């Protein structure tokens, strides 16, 4: 069966446009790079291989050969991978453009066949090449595509020669077939017309073609934060915020949509060549503040959390405790977003003040029934189980009933940050000494959402943005977040 790699290798000699479009990494020298231990189709050479992460989108979709070309389907340079990429929604006109792309880049006619016969080394006898010499001429046109689902309305489809579905559940895409959205008979006629130029004995490949063109579609996979690699994440030790490096091939030429790009492919090939010749490999540094990272960090925080702090007598913040084996968490918070650190300090301080105001406890080495609930409370932040967990924590503080309402005391001294936060949340001039469940819950929710408005957070990293969006955000100054650096009085915070 013909492979996409073979077709790119031989067809790159036909035209000046092909020399640039068909230059894929799989036909060059292999450079050693780490892989993600994920088996799947490389989207650039359409081969089954161990995938490694792409520097443009941080998703594993290229092999160790093709990754050295540094191409991503989200680039705006019109290379072959970009030309095979179509954004949702799929229309019949877009599918026709994909078919025209194959006919332009990989034509099959008498002139092309004769040229390839002259180009292939014959040595002693053509019989030695009875199978090999024409392999690249048997490339069928299929409408199979690798589908990336970022959300319900943000989907990308990368068309190529995929001979079967993806078996690895960790691959970020799924193979779908759009033959029903086009026209089965019309696509068959296009392929029969292409193959009619080949010798009769080669037309038996039609049976294999039908198997590929009728490949059933797989159920789309929703991409989550865990699918993105950590290799492109950069932690800014100065601002204490995570960021992500995004590399894209950027050209000054712009197209309104895919249809205009394919129109230039047919009518103005020199424009595409000029765009590829003048493109620049550009680095974008973007913030990594998204809901996926927030949930991952909250999960890690709950795992490393030291709930013994709520029974301790430490005067400092929970994140500053360093020499207490029951409360030390500084090793984890040293390289974490300062907003998470501030939230952890306020939350633990508030629960500590409430708990010690109502329950007779010793110090941080004592064993309390509330400890497991503290971890559960952190894990339940920004989830639907938050209200239930807050109520359980409240009930473990020995509330008393006053006029039919359960209340707890708040009589310990508060630090200035927590004092201002409670005043702002309850909208009062002085802190009450008695809290009911609604007030307690409001304070906990206010502390957790002090720095994060979940409704406005993106679900996935900025690396899923198109190159045009990244350029626009960079020019407007919204690509990175700007915060005032929190300066602590503790010398340990500056380490």
From Swiss-Prot:
The keyword Phosphoprotein does not apply. Residues 1-81 are annotated as: RNA-binding. Residues 42-79 are annotated as: Zinc-binding domain. It is found in: Host cytoplasm, Host cytoskeleton. GO terms for molecular function: metal ion binding; RNA binding. Transmembrane segments: none annotated. Coiled coil: none annotated. Keywords: Host cytoplasm, Host cytoskeleton, Host-virus interaction, Inhibition of host innate immune response by virus, Inhibition of host IRF3 by virus, Inhibition of host IRF7 by virus, Inhibition of host RLR pathway by virus, Interferon antiviral system evasion, Metal-binding, RNA-binding, Viral immunoevasion. GO terms for cellular component: host cell cytoplasm; host cytoskeleton. Residues 320-495 are annotated as: Interaction with host IRF3. A motif (pLxIS motif) lies at residues 485-488. One of its GO terms (biological process) is symbiont-mediated suppression of host cytoplasmic pattern recognition receptor signaling pathway via inhibition of IRF3 activity. Plays a role in the inhibition of host innate immunity by inducing the degradation of key host factors required to activate interferon production such as IRF3, IRF5 or IRF7. Associates with components of cullin RING ligases (CRLs) including CUL1 or CUL3, which are essential multisubunit ubiquitination complexes, to modulate their activities. The integrity of the zinc-binding domain in NSP1 is important for degradation of host IRF3. The pLxIS motif targets host IRF3 for degradation; however phosphorylation of NSP1 pLxIS motif is not required for its activity. HAMAP family: ROTA_NSP1. Belongs to the rotavirus NSP1 family. This is Non-structural protein 1. It comes from Rotavirus A (strain RVA/SA11-Both/G3P5B[2]) (RV-A).
């Amino acid at each position: 069966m013909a492979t996409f790699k073979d077709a790119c290798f031989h067809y790159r000699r036909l035209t000046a446009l092909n020399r640039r479009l068909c230059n894929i990494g799989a036909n060059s020298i292999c450079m050693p790079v780490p892989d993600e231990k994920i088996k799947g189709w490389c989207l650039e050479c359409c081969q089954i291989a161990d995938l490694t992460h792409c520097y443009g989108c941080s998703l594993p979709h290229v092999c160790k050969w093709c990754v050295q070309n540094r191409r991503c389907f989200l680039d705006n340079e019109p290379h072959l991978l970009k030309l095979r990429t179509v954004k949702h929604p799929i229309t019949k006109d877009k599918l026709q453009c994909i078919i025209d792309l194959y006919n332009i880049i990989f034509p099959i006619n008498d002139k092309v066949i004769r040229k390839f016969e002259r180009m292939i080394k014959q040595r002693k006898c053509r019989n030695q090449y009875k199978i090999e010499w024409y392999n690249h001429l048997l490339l069928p046109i299929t409408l199979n595509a690798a589908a990336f689902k970022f959300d319900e309305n943000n989907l990308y489809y990368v068309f190529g020669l995929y001979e079967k579905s993806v078996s690895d559940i960790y691959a970020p895409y799924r193979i779908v077939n759009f033959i029903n959205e086009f026209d089965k008979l019309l696509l068959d006629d296009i392929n029969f017309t292409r193959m009619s130029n080949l010798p009769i004995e080669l037309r038996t490949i039609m049976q294999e073609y039908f198997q590929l063109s009728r490949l059933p579609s797989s159920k789309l996979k929703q991409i989550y934060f865990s699918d993105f690699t950590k290799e492109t994440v950069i932690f800014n030790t100065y601002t204490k915020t995570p960021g992500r490096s995004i590399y894209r091939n950027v050209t000054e030429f712009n197209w309104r949509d895919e249809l205009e790009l394919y129109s230039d492919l047919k009518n103005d090939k020199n424009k595409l060549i000029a765009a590829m010749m003048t493109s620049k490999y550009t680095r974008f540094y973007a913030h990594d503040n998204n809901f996926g990272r927030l949930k991952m960090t909250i999960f890690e925080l709950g795992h490393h959390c030291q709930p013994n702090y709520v029974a301790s007598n430490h005067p400092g913040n929970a994140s500053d405790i360093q020499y207490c084996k029951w409360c030390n968490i500084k090793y984890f918070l040293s390289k974490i977003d300062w907003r998470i650190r501030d939230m952890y300090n306020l939350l633990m301080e508030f629960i500590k003040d409430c708990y010690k105001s109502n329950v007779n406890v010793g110090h941080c080495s004592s064993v309390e029934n509330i400890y497991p609930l503290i971890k559960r409370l952190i894990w339940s932040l920004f989830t639907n189980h938050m209200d239930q967990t807050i109520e359980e924590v409240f009930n473990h503080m020995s509330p008393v009933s006053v006029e039919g309402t359960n209340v707890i005391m708040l009589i310990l001294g508060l630090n200035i940050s927590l004092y201002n936060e409670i005043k702002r949340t309850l909208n009062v001039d002085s802190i009450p000494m008695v809290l009911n469940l609604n007030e307690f819950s409001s304070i906990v929710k206010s502390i957790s959402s002090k720095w994060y408005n979940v409704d406005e957070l993106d679900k996935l990293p900025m690396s899923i943005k198109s190159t045009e969006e990244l350029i626009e955000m960079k020019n407007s100054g919204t690509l990175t977040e700007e915060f005032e650096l929190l300066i602590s009085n503790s010398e340990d915070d500056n380490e």
